C-alpha cells in the first residue's frame, strides 16, 4: 500500500522587542542566568502585567503579510500547566479569540507554487529554560520567561518533508523582512513543532498524529518528519497502532523518541486572563501597520528584473534576505552597473560572508565602497583580477577603492607600447608554443594571455592585451 505524509507546523517566533511582553525587563538573548527577571515575570502576588503595544503591532504586521483576518477584538488567556521552568504555573497566551486567523503563505517549490493555509497567529509569552548539562543537577534560567512570541499554526497542508522545510524557510523570510524577528533557529528565535501523520493515498480521513519537538534547523525538520513518517508506516504495516504523543527529535541518533502523551486543549484549562484587558485593533493601527509593510521578496525581485535588467535568477538570490537586497540596491546606486553589482554581491561578497560566518550588516565593505570599486572596473581603471586584490585589502582597510589603487600602484596599464613590448618578449621566449599556435593550435591563445598578465602583474588591460596579442600572433 502507498501512503502519503500529512504535515502541519506550529512555529514559535520570538519577537525582537527591547522589553518583554508584559513587563519592562530586557528581552535580550544571552544575558547571565536569572538577571532579566522581575515580580511580573514570576507572577508574584500584587504584580500586574501590561501588554507591550509593540507586540500587538508586530502581530498585526505578520497577519497582514500572511493574508490573515485581523481580529479587532481579541483576548489574552491563561494556559495552565506545571513545569519547573514556568514559575507562574500558567502561560499567558490566546485561545478562543486569537489576534489573526485564516491566513495563507505562498511557497515556491521546484514543481510550482504551494499554498499553505494558516489556522491562526496568536500572541503568547515564552517560558523559562531548564539546563541539564551542568553536572548531575538540573538548573532553571527564567530570563526567557515573558519574552514575547507569536505562534503561527498551519493547517495540515504539507505532504512532504521538503514542503514543510520550504514553508518554514518562507515564514522565516517573512518575519525577517518585516523586521520583527531575527529568525535564528539555533538561538531559539524560531522554534518549530511538526504534527505528522500518514494515510493511504486517496484517503480523506487523517491518521493519528504525533508531535515532534527539538528541531533546530531546516535540515533537521526534514529529517525528523521523514523519520517519523517511516516509523508510522512501519507500525501500521506491522499491525500496530499509532499512539498520539509528543516525541523528541534526537539529531545525533537521527531518530525520534517518546517524550510524553499528547495533550489536548482542555488539559490546559484555558480561561481569560483577569489581569489583562482585551486587545483592540482600531482603524488607525491597521492603517499604520499597512503603511509600514516592506516591499516583499517576490515584488522586489520583479522590480530588480524590470528596473535594473538583471536575470530573474540573480534577483531571486539577492532578495532572499532583506539586508542583502538593501546592500545590492545601495551598491547599484553608486556603481551604475546593476549586472556587475549583482555578480560581485553573489560572488565575492556572499563567498566572504559564508567563509567568515558573517551577516551582511557585519561586513566591512559598505555598499558605497563596493560601488566605487565596481565603478573603477567599468571605467577601465583596474582589471577584474586587480579588483579582487583591492576587495581583499578593503576588508582590512577603511580607504576607498580609488585610494587603495593609487597607494598600491595597482592602476590598470593601457599603454599599448608597454603591453606590446611585454607580448613580444613572451613570444620570443615561447617559440615552440608560437609555432604550435600558428600551426592551428589556437587554444594556446589563452596561454599567451596568461603569460602577459603574469608578466605585468595583472595590471594590463585585458582588452588591449587581446587586441595586440591577436595582431602579433596572426602577423
From Swiss-Prot:
EC number per UniProt: 6.3.5.-
ATP-binding found in the keyword field: yes
Listed SMART domains: GatB_Yqey
Pfam families recorded: GatB_N, GatB_Yqey
Annotated GO biological process: glutaminyl-tRNAGln biosynthesis via transamidation; translation
Protein keywords: ATP-binding, Ligase, Nucleotide-binding, Protein biosynthesis
GO molecular function, a single term: asparaginyl-tRNA synthase (glutamine-hydrolyzing) activity
Catalytic activity annotation: L-glutamyl-tRNA(Gln) + L-glutamine + ATP + H2O = L-glutaminyl-tRNA(Gln) + L-glutamate + ADP + phosphate + H(+); L-aspartyl-tRNA(Asn) + L-glutamine + ATP + H2O = L-asparaginyl-tRNA(Asn) + L-glutamate + ADP + phosphate + 2 H(+)
InterPro entries: Asn/Gln-tRNA_amidoTrfase_suB/E, Asn/Gln-tRNA_Trfase_suB/E_cat, Asn/Gln_amidotransferase, Asn/Gln_tRNA_amidoTrase-B-like, GatB, GatB_C_1, GatB_Yqey_C_2, Gln-tRNA_amidoTrfase_suB_CS
PANTHER family reported for this sequence: GLUTAMYL-TRNA GLN AMIDOTRANSFERASE SUBUNIT B MITOCHONDRIAL AND PROKARYOTIC PET112-RELATED, GLUTAMYL-TRNA(GLN) AMIDOTRANSFERASE SUBUNIT B, MITOCHONDRIAL
Stated role: Allows the formation of correctly charged Asn-tRNA(Asn) or Gln-tRNA(Gln) through the transamidation of misacylated Asp-tRNA(Asn) or Glu-tRNA(Gln) in organisms which lack either or both of asparaginyl-tRNA or glutaminyl-tRNA synthetases. The reaction takes place in the presence of glutamine and ATP through an activated phospho-Asp-tRNA(Asn) or phospho-Glu-tRNA(Gln).
Family to which the UniProt record says this protein belongs: Belongs to the GatB/GatE family. GatB subfamily.
Assembly with partners or alone: Heterotrimer of A, B and C subunits.
Protein's name in the database: Aspartyl/glutamyl-tRNA(Asn/Gln) amidotransferase subunit B
Organism: Chlorobaculum parvum (strain DSM 263 / NCIMB 8327) (Chlorobium vibrioforme subsp. thiosulfatophilum)
